[in-house]
């Protein structure tokens, strides 16, 4: 375990307790907040070996209800096969800068939803993922070059990809600054990076925390206990700009946008309601940036 006395992003010593959760299973139980940059992070934090052990068989764990979840993903694949470029842009705004036949890298590809969109646009597909079962799943459905492990170990060449997609991964890593720097290195000049991650500055996080404090209860963790860092929008943007990336779009889903998508999704009503709640309160953010052409 790693114990932080200072904020791992800005170095400030001004930290305070933020949440604790001892009821659920996960590599972390407590979080702190940096009062300077507003980052929320696990402290103590699992080290690289502990996280690697946790992510082994990640998509087979009980909380993913593995068989049903994979069936849901396959339903998405079938639906995406019928979409054209304009429909993909409307449904997945974070891919609006993705051009057909681009060289596309999905970091932490999971079960391949991002790959499905890129494949529909006839892109050349690459993917990294820790979970071997997930990699086997995507290879069974797409012509994708895969790497099992972290982005550093893949050793991709400089200026190699037209588009990098990293959805709900940056909040799982141990060094987000270095991660963004590495993605900047392997991105072509003029290429795009799309980062999807929770938004700690959302109304739902604030409401949940203060509703607990008012009742004299210790706030618990409402997202995944495996998360290492949860970013406010302003901080995520500044981390990208510090690496020289130019932010083109930075948004959270509004209710109407996601509701129109969810009508067509084949998933249990409970999951649909959960997704709606997350998007009504702007729990998740997308940041799309590009590497300048010098």
PLM feature spans:
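Conserved N-terminal segment of class I S-adenosyl-L-methionine
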Residues: 1-159, 163-167, 177-180, 250-253, ...
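S-adenosyl-L-methionine-dependent methyltransferase catalytic module, highlighting the catalytic core
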Residues: 152, 166, 174-182, 192-294
């Amino acid at each position: 375990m790693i114990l932080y006395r200072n904020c791992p992003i800005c170095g400030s010593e001004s930290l305070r307790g933020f949440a604790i959760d001892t009821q659920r299973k996960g590599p972390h139980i407590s979080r702190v907040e940096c009062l300077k940059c507003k980052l929320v992070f696990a402290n103590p934090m699992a080290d690289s070996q502990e996280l690697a052990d946790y992510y082994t068989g990640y998509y087979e764990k009980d909380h993913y209800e593995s068989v049903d979840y994979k069936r849901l993903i396959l339903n998405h694949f079938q639906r995406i096969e019928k979409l054209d470029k304009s429909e993909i842009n409307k449904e997945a705004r974070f891919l609006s800068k993705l051009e057909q036949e681009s060289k596309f890298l999905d970091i932490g590809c999971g079960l391949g939803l991002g790959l499905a969109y890129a494949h529909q646009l006839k892109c050349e597909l690459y993917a990294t993922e820790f979970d071997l079962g997930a990699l086997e799943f995507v290879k069974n459905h797409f012509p994708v070059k895969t790497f099992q492990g972290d982005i550093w170990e893949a050793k991709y060449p400089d200026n190699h990809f037209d588009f990098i997609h990293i959805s709900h991964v940056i909040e799982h890593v141990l060094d987000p600054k270095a991660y963004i720097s590495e993605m900047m290195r392997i991105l072509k000049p003029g290429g795009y990076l799309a980062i999807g991650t929770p938004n700690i500055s959302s109304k739902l996080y604030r409401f949940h925390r203060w509703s607990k404090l008012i009742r004299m209860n210790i706030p618990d963790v409402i997202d995944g206990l495996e998360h290492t860092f949860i970013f406010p929008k302003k901080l995520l943007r500044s981390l990208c700009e510090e690496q020289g990336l130019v932010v083109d779009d930075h948004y959270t889903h509004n209710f109407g946008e996601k509701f129109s998508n969810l009508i067509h999704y084949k998933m249990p009503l409970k999951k649909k309601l959960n997704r709606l709640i997350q998007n009504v309160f702007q729990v998740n953010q997308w940041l799309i940036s590009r590497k300048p052409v010098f």
